[in-house]
């Protein structure tokens, strides 16, 4: 039976079967997903579905997206805005653009971490300036927010976070830490919180905590009376131990973990940790960037789909500030050598507003 011209004019893309629409969406760049999510409720639902993510994975269409949080100073307080890295139209240059979402519903003091295609904003402060246990999640496929189960303890003072095997580990953010609130663990699959056992009460007395997930263990550093303390928790053995001293040196610098290798930016050099010889080695082929802070202070480092992305600020004048970004391709050679080859480096953001580069994340998109 032939379709009449009137029927043809009434036929729309949204009337197609879900399987066919998913097949089309899976082949479209995720750069367009936030805009497509406004087409209809059906599109928004399909874009946020696990089926689409699974289909993209099956087709080999997944990639990492770079999200950058900047903190801007206002007359009375701070506001945090999220940007994503996009390529300019008809150009190979890349720029940071604000995400097409409502203002971030989380406080700039929140702990923020990426798991899969989600960005979790953990804790911070409520509107009445009290500590918050709230957890908000942004789906990077549609740039929509939802609420996750709250923590058991309110944390408002920049809690440190890391991800290991689909679980989010949160430490600090409280003024009075003890064995009941030192570390909380969130299982993203079961959506449940639990506390992690601690070795002793003494480790809770520090402040300025940092936590890193590396080689089936979480590594914690803290400061107390200008003295750093380091502890390692082995997940499968369920026990705490002191890490090797050379490994603990990686906590003082910008760092990230890629395929079970610990990398850091230290004194204008990218280095990786040789866990067999217990030493730090320079990444061969990487050219020093003298424009950065020599110690790496303020440099943000992130695992970007198996490569390293570095971001840093350059103050040109009192008002004008640039944000640089560069991507370094990681190549593992025989005999255990690791090379870092510069893929691109450019200014991705220019502003005359007072702001600070807070963090960088690379969720799956």
Curated annotation (Swiss-Prot):
Kelch repeats lie at residues 118-165, 167-213. Keywords: Kelch repeat, Repeat. Residues 10-58 form the F-box domain. It comes from the Eukaryota. Disulfide bonds: none annotated. It holds the Pfam family Kelch_FKB95. SUPFAM superfamilies: F-box domain (SSF81383), Kelch motif (SSF117281). The keyword Repeat applies. CDD domains: F-box_AtAFR-like. It comes from Arabidopsis thaliana. This is Putative F-box/kelch-repeat protein At4g39290.
